[in-house]
């Protein structure tokens, strides 16, 4: 935050050059902090090389595949959206090292694209562009777990920001298409869409674009994965929502009061809390409050009520906080980043 607050004293070339350099360095390093990249490849190989639907089959169904050994979630079907899964189908025929390289380069480019779009959105909103871009591009979790580990959240992020930028330019139909495309990478990005819809000048066009994208994705999913695949996709997303990670706000809250972990019977409380906060923020947006800022607060509320939380999930929030009309959201985002760093440090040290 010190760098961001002093951005006015930095030259844009040197500051953005540092962002690009850090992205290149983390892109060139091996994906040592997470194994999700092998899961991405495995789901594509299930579909293309083994003729199995990745929403109804798991890595352990093909024990002889060499990628399976490095997959972390060997018993779990793909939790990712159809657009990303179809992208992994393209990678499946490639040699593994080449496919990893494509994902590493792709996520780095997507992250830099998100930085560039944050800059562009800030200028459109009349807000300082360089601090907003640095707030996103210099976040350590984005660099280490996003770019370094090649997480697909960065593909989702650049599509979300494309939708935001298009909405700010009153290109509402295309904004709806981009927002749905982001949700077809990871469903959590769909949270931005209702705020975007309320804030749009031509809501009907945005809704039409979104519905068209949904229809096209539904047809593509039906052709590629079949009815059982679509059912499996929905079931897996629901199942993932019931998981509990070692560190999350709900889990750590109960640990602070002496419990070993979040009691199963109390897990439904947190989705209810999020639903209430979401309803209040949507109402506030309907009454004229800034929709980008409220989408940011809603994303923070989602992250704080998830029972399954990973460090790189903070990238969902970064650009919305950077573009917000209040410093409070940026400070809250930094505090949440510190919480995630502390939680991961505890895991690594124990």
Model-derived features: positions:
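Membrane-interfacial helix-loop-helix junctions in multi-pass membrane proteins
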Residues: 259-262
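Multi-pass membrane glycosyltransferase architecture that uses lipid-linked
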Residues: 1-235, 241-244, 251, 255-257, ...
């Amino acid at each position: 935050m010190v760098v961001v607050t002093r951005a006015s004293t930095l030259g844009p070339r040197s500051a953005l050059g540092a962002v690009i350099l850090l992205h290149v360095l983390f892109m060139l390093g091996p994906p040592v902090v997470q194994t999700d990249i092998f899961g991405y490849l495995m789901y594509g190989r299930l579909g293309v090389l083994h003729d199995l639907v990745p929403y109804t089959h798991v890595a352990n169904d093909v024990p002889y595949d060499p990628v399976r050994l490095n997959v972390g979630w060997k018993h779990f079907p793909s939790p990712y959206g159809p657009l990303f899964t179809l992208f992994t189908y393209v990678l499946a025929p490639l040699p593994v090292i080449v496919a990893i390289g494509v994902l590493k380069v792709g996520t780095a480019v997507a992250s830099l694209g998100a930085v560039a779009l944050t800059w562009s959105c800030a200028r459109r909103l009349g807000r300082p562009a360089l601090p907003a871009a640095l707030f996103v591009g210099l976040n350590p979790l984005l660099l280490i777990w996003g770019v370094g580990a090649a997480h697909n959240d960065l593909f989702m992020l650049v599509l979300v920001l494309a939708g935001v930028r298009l909405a700010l330019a009153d290109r509402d139909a295309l904004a709806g298409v981009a927002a749905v495309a982001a949700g077809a990478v990871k469903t959590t990005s769909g949270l931005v869409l209702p705020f975007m819809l309320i804030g749009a000048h031509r809501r009907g066009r945005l809704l039409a674009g979104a519905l068209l994208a949904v229809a096209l994705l539904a047809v593509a999913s039906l052709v590629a994965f079949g009815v059982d695949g679509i059912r499996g996709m929905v079931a897996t997303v629901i199942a993932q929502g019931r998981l509990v990670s070692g560190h999350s706000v709900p889990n750590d809250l109960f640990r602070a009061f002496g419990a070993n972990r979040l009691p199963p019977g109390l897990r439904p409380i947190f989705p209810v809390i999020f639903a209430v906060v979401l309803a209040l923020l949507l109402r506030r947006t309907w009454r004229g409050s800034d929709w980008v800022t409220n989408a940011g607060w809603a994303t923070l509320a989602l992250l704080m009520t998830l029972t399954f939380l990973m460090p790189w999930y903070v990238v969902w929030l970064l650009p919305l906080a950077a573009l917000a009309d209040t410093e409070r959201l940026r400070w809250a985002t930094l505090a949440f980043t510190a919480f995630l760093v502390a939680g991961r440090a505890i895991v690594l040290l124990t």
